[in-house]
Amino acid sequence: MYAIIRLKGSVNTRPEIKDTLRMLRLNQINHCVVVEENPTYKGMIQVVKDYVAFGVINADTLAMIMEHRGRLEGGDRLTNEYVAKNSSYKSIKEFAAAVAEGKAKLGDMPGLKPVFRMHPPRKGHKGLKRTYQQGGALGNYGEEIASLVEQMR
């Protein structure tokens, strides 16, 4: 599973990049989506790599995102009680583990919004003009995306 977080706006952006961000449902800065690893999403990530931060996410990080930022239709928070009532899983952590293993999808939870609206990172970005490998905030974080997600919880 990949976590993709939009970090830059759309001013002076090429139309194909805007379209790809729209297809990924990354309509605003600090929005986060979780997608599966397949060639289609890898190609889409490659197109928007200069506007987003992305990396491989684990079950614990996904559970943290869902607990802090998971919203239902109507704006209510995602709770353990809602998960237990509307699915075969007993808690958010159990559901997140199933999603990370590929046994379930985020869309299996009725009413769960597909986009997580994150806060700006605590202590700020490292810089939005450079990639993560160059000391900035954009591009591929790999497994270290969890640190950025933790700052933006």
From Swiss-Prot:
Highest taxon of source: Archaea
Q: Name one GO biological process term.
A: translation
Q: GO terms for molecular function, please?
A: RNA binding; structural constituent of ribosome
Q: Which SUPFAM superfamilies match?
A: Ribosomal protein L30p/L7e (SSF55129)
Q: Which GO terms describe its cellular component?
A: cytosolic large ribosomal subunit
Query: Which key words are in the record?
Result: Ribonucleoprotein, Ribosomal protein
Q: Which residues form a coiled coil?
A: none
Query: By its UniProt entry, which Gene3D superfamilies does this protein fall under?
Result: 1.10.15.30, Ribosomal protein L30, ferredoxin-like fold domain
Q: Which CDD domains match?
A: Ribosomal_L7_archeal_euk
The record ties this protein, via Pfam families, to:
Ribosomal_L30
As for family, the record states: Belongs to the universal ribosomal protein uL30 family.
On subunit structure and binding partners, the annotation says: Part of the 50S ribosomal subunit.
Protein name, per record: Large ribosomal subunit protein uL30
Source organism: Methanocella arvoryzae (strain DSM 22066 / NBRC 105507 / MRE50)
